[in-house]
């Protein structure tokens, strides 16, 4: 198994872990002025988001700025919080170098979103994934 940390190592924020060059676990941002984003632009086959905080989901729409449209797997509350915070990021930084995604990218998120409940296994990029309640915030998940 190949694991690459694209952010979130030795820092709090911009969590992004690429597994076997195909499964991306989280794709967050480090809030600040200017905000910082993961160090690479991966091209995953699927994305799994653990919870909706900016440091874990804040850069997810940027994954949809190119031609590929990987499915984004998350719980329903995580999806709603992540989309709401992305809308807020666009209001604050949209159209500037401080925001790596556009309104079109955010619209695409809804088109590739796949919501899952706890304890329901699902396939993602050749892996079987199951969410378990992490108890951090509503919808947060341990990802196994």
PLM features per residue range, with description:
Residues 1-4, 18, 120-144:
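Catalytic core of the metallo-beta-lactamase
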Residues 106-126:
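Alpha-helix-centered segments that form part of catalytic cores
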Residues 9-14, 18-70, 74-113:
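Pre-active-site segment of Zn-dependent metallo-hydrolases
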């Amino acid at each position: 198994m190949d694991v690459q940390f694209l952010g979130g190592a030795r820092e709090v924020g911009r969590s992004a872990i690429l597994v076997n060059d195909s499964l991306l676990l989280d794709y967050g941002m480090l809030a600040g002025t200017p905000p910082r984003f993961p160090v690479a632009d991966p091209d995953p086959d699927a994305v799994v988001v653990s919870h909706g905080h900016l440091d874990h989901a804040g850069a997810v729409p940027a994954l949809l700025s190119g031609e590929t449209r990987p499915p984004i797997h998350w719980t329903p509350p995580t999806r709603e919080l992540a989309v709401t915070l992305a809308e807020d990021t666009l209001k604050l930084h949209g159209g500037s170098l401080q925001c790596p995604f556009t309104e079109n990218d955010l619209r695409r998120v809804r088109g590739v979103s796949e919501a899952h409940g706890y304890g329901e296994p699902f396939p993602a990029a050749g892996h079987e994934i199951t969410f378990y309640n992490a108890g951090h915030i509503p919808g947060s998940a341990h990802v196994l």
